[in-house]
Amino acid sequence: MNDTFFNRMLATNAGAGALALRVPVGIIFAAHGAQKLFGWFGGYGLEGTGQFFGSVGLHPGYLMALLAGAVEFFGGLALVFGLLVRPAAAALAFAMLIAIFAVHFSQGFFLDKGGYEYALALFAASVSLLFSGGGRHSADVALAARSGGGR
């Protein structure tokens, strides 16, 4: 891997605001991923989520559930720990775009009707972290320093 690209991906000058955003958003994503993958927190697991995904046109449903669950669970954990925040945020933003247009958009804007407002907020938070990086209080800063890059 190109060291310059790696260091640029990890570089961040963001302060505590990035920490204040990425930790709760990461917890939210990880919890939703755990629902999809493991059936934790009242989720349906891969079988139920896969059937639902298939019913809304995301085929093959099981594979799409596995991908969405993995992105949300592991991407969420990456945000919490501040590890590879930009790639995690990019994957999470993409997952939210799919959720918005494949599941929620036809239900309108408001969450009480199954709309896309919550997914849009998570998309916006992910894009913000994609731009800012994990911030000074992230594992990315330590990785960048170790590889010879700076903030």
Model-derived regions, located:
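Extended, low-polarity transmembrane helix blocks
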Residues: 1-40, 62-70, 74, 81-151
